[in-house]
């Protein structure tokens, strides 16, 4: 990822509370962090997985053409009955026969269990963005919310295995701040 490709995704979140910053900037497995802080049962609830076109701001990062399909997977991470994170991942179609073929059958398993248990997987630095209604992921992230916020913080990074990448974007829902 270069600066031109990430012009509106920043290397550090600005104007954010220390509590929210702790969630956003943690480089470990978000799944494991939520599981440790969740007093209820943790679960992954898939809402979409299919070959699809990707968001405009993902094209250059993933080196995809506008008409090129990728596997798009969207899930909510729940603490009990409360969604705390909306996760969106993108894998180029051509990489589904290679390094990332195991992602097709993840179902309600966490992607983090695949990414953080393989020592060969490399991660780029996190990038951050405050999503508004103008971003396509904002409305998708808000589907499970009773009240739509004015904005939502998101982070994303590339995970690479054998030269093939998956882009993972995590959108933090307001309820994440209620976890101890």
Swiss-Prot record:
Top EC class of this enzyme: lyase
Enzyme Commission code(s) on record: 4.1.3.40
Cell compartments where the protein resides: Cytoplasm
InterPro entries in alphabetical order: Chorismate--pyruvate_lyase (IPR007440), Chorismate_lyase_/UTRA_dom_sf (IPR028978)
Keywords: Cytoplasm, Lyase, Pyruvate, Ubiquinone biosynthesis
Record: residues binding substrate: 73, 111, 170
Gene Ontology CC annotations of this record: cytosol
Pathway the protein takes part in: Cofactor biosynthesis; ubiquinone biosynthesis
GO BP annotations, alphabetical order: pyruvate biosynthetic process; ubiquinone biosynthetic process
Reactions accelerated catalytically: chorismate = 4-hydroxybenzoate + pyruvate
GO function term, MF aspect, one: chorismate lyase activity
Family: Belongs to the UbiC family.
Protein function: Removes the pyruvyl group from chorismate, with concomitant aromatization of the ring, to provide 4-hydroxybenzoate (4HB) for the ubiquinone pathway.
HAMAP family: UbiC (MF_01632)
Record-given protein name: Probable chorismate pyruvate-lyase
Protein source organism: Nitrosospira multiformis (strain ATCC 25196 / NCIMB 11849 / C 71)
